[in-house]
Amino acid sequence: MVDLTPVIETMEHRWMRAWVNGDMRGLKAITAKNFILLTGSKPPVILDRASWIEGAAKRYLASSYRFADIYARGFGGIAIFSATLELKATMDGRDWSGLLFVTDVWRKRRIGGWKLVQRVVSKPDDTPHLAKAIKSLQLWKA
């Protein structure tokens, strides 16, 4: 089985750099036509591709980013990427910087290669006991 982690990480950085650099053409090139961005807010909100790209170009402006705690997994022509994302950004001139958790779904096309089809964005839960409690359910020891 091929490890898709380096391929998908590269695509993630291409996508984020396009946003940071205001390269909407580059962003469009690797964003699927049926892309959605789903926020883990209350209530959840969905943006389609056109809304996301318009917002990223004019209102929600990123200036830098850093991924950490990266997890990637491939399933043939589908790949999942999850990571914490430290983002410096503004929305309508107001600071929107912070730590996020993103889960992205990538699909490989015969023509055009890998395209981002979905991004789910939420705030990480830093409740101290949560990670420990979930980890205690693991049947293996890491």
Q: Model-flagged regions — what are they?
A:
Residues 1-30, 36-142:
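A beta-strand edge to alpha-helix "cap/lid" segment located at domain peripheries
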